[in-house]
Amino acid sequence: MFKNVLFPVDQSREAREAAEVVVNIVQQYGSHLVLLSVVEVPAPGEEPPQASPMTSPEAIAELLKTAQTLFTERGVQAQTLEREGKPAFVICDVADEIDADLIVMGCRGLGLTEEGASESVTTRVINLSPCPVLVVP
């Protein structure tokens, strides 16, 4: 059912909590797991993100290594990908590239305001994704 599962990772608590769900899905369905981390690059004329560790390729590489180790310890093999760009767009592009059957994401809970909902990477992925998205609260 879920042959290819994409799990975008960052340094958030929500991503760590969603990892347990990913392990269960991958083990239950014998899925191929792809871990993705995105180095956020500002658009021309846009301010760079405020001192975010997600803008450093070195920090991203370390994050992916740590995530891969976490899954390996649970008996799950994972492929890692590092990309640059706007997270929501990159996540959807990679899902299309790898023919993902499911994207699993944590949810940060930016609030019920219209602005918070529209700015959420998760919301954008849900709206743009070429496959189902499982949001782990």
Located regions from the model:
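Conserved beta-strand positions in the Rossmann-like core of class I SAM-dependent methyltransferases
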Residues: V34, Q79, L134
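Gly/Ser-rich helix-loop-strand patches that form or flank binding pockets
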Residues: N24, D93-P137
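Structural beta-alpha unit
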Residues: T69-I103
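Generic structural signal for helix capping and beta-alpha/helix-loop junctions
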Residues: P42-A43, A88, L112
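Short glycine/serine/threonine/alanine-rich loop segments
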Residues: S31-H32, V76, A100, C131
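A short acidic, glycine-rich active-site loop
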Residues: P48, S52-E62
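Small/aliphatic-rich secondary-structure junction motif
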Residues: K3-P49
